[in-house]
């Protein structure tokens, strides 16, 4: 069957309108590599900054750090709301689905190499306005995730210092450190720091997981007397509680939209699939095993973030070991948003890869603006679960479900009227898109209800609050 035709888009498509592509994520394989390389955002062997230096192994570590992050501190609580069976099914199901849609995005990127981000891809379908709207959505998503990282880092600094100063100051220090890391220009130079961040974060989580099996009772449980652990294979939460916890599990592995800028900096973009599959398997296995152990020993008495569940000493040890990894991981999220805005502003200009004042001023200015925005959001909604829920429903549900399904249907539009098997594939992608729309509406509604409730009950007392947010400090 004939391959779909690339839509002409004046800003990005220098090739003729009748040039054919061969989608990889389907029945055919292969591509015009030479033409694809010529349309890549970053070129090799340039007089300036060399961006195309990332190996597939280093890309794997970046993908691991993007996905294995502060969500592990929220997922055990999600199992408390959904039960071990319901939570496990969500982890396995969402991880598998997110890995699949990540492959869809990678194949689309390979077929349309001029696309640097998801905004560029959606611009092929929706035009200039679509590209700009999705671009804004990318920035909003990363600001929400960065804000969640600032909140969690401030909790860690509070725990380590026994609330040594105003929480706002800890949040400010966290925002500065995250912004400094995100300002490193290339993913290759982020590489060794990313390795360090991933190892320290996993080590901190592992220390906590082992420690939580050795305590008599979770720190949040009653100090004396009998208590009900609350562990259950199947739980029956309210719609709002169930939805936000399912969304928090979903967001844990839906960082595929942030993989795309990394592809543009890989030595061999074709190795993306290998890196994506390896990272997806490792992350899914760690989330499932760690979360089930934590839930088994803490039940419904899980602190948020989860490190507080093992008591004040272990919480300090876990935060002390993992805090560098947490800050470095959130810095990658902010780096992706900054790289999008940077390329958007300087694309096709001499300043994109040249060490000019305009190059540096634009890059550092964008990072400063994003860090400031994330700090303000963190102080306005200082609860990790709600920030993750907002990001998951408003941004990552479209990024990981709706948009990949639309892009697949764009490249395989002929499947709509093809053979029975092709029609079934087309229909399955429509179902993925419908699931995404459901998560947008239901997830946003659930988070809004809980945030309103938090303000009404005093869980969020005020913005820019100096009070200790770490809990159980003794």
Swiss-Prot record:
InterPro entries tied to this protein: AA_transpt_TM
Membrane-spanning residues: 72-92, 133-153, 164-184, 192-212, 231-251, 275-295, 317-337, 364-384, 387-407, 431-451
Example of a GO MF term: L-amino acid transmembrane transporter activity
Keywords from the UniProt entry: Membrane, Transmembrane, Transmembrane helix, Transport
Regions of compositional bias (Polar residues) in chain numbering: 1-15
Alphabetical list of Pfam families matching this protein: Aa_trans (PF01490)
Intrachain disulfide bonds: none
Membrane topology recorded in Swiss-Prot or TrEMBL: Multi-pass membrane protein
Cellular location(s): Membrane
Region (Disordered): 1-39
Gene Ontology cellular component list: membrane
Highest taxon of source: Eukaryota
Expression induction or repression: Expression is induced in response to 2-benzoxazolinone (BOA) exposure.
Function, as annotated: Transmembrane transporter; part of the Fusarium detoxification of benzoxazolinone cluster 2 (FDB2) involved in the degradation of benzoxazolinones produced by the host plant. Maize, wheat, and rye produce the 2 benzoxazinone phytoanticipins 2,4-dihy-droxy-7-methoxy-1,4-benzoxazin-3-one (DIMBOA) and 2,4-dihydroxy-1,4-benzoxazin-3-one (DIBOA) that, due to their inherent instability once released, spontaneously degrade to the more stable corresponding benzoxazolinones, 6-methoxy-2-benzoxazolinone (MBOA) and 2-benzoxazolinone (BOA), respectively.
Note: Fusarium verticillioides possesses 2 unlinked loci, FDB1 and FDB2, necessary for detoxification of antimicrobial compounds produced by maize, including 2-benzoxazolinone (BOA). The FDB2 cluster arose as a duplication of the FDB1 cluster with rearrangement and expansion by incorporating additional genes.
Family, similarity comment: Belongs to the amino acid/polyamine transporter 2 family.
Name of the protein in question: Transmembrane transporter FVEG_12640
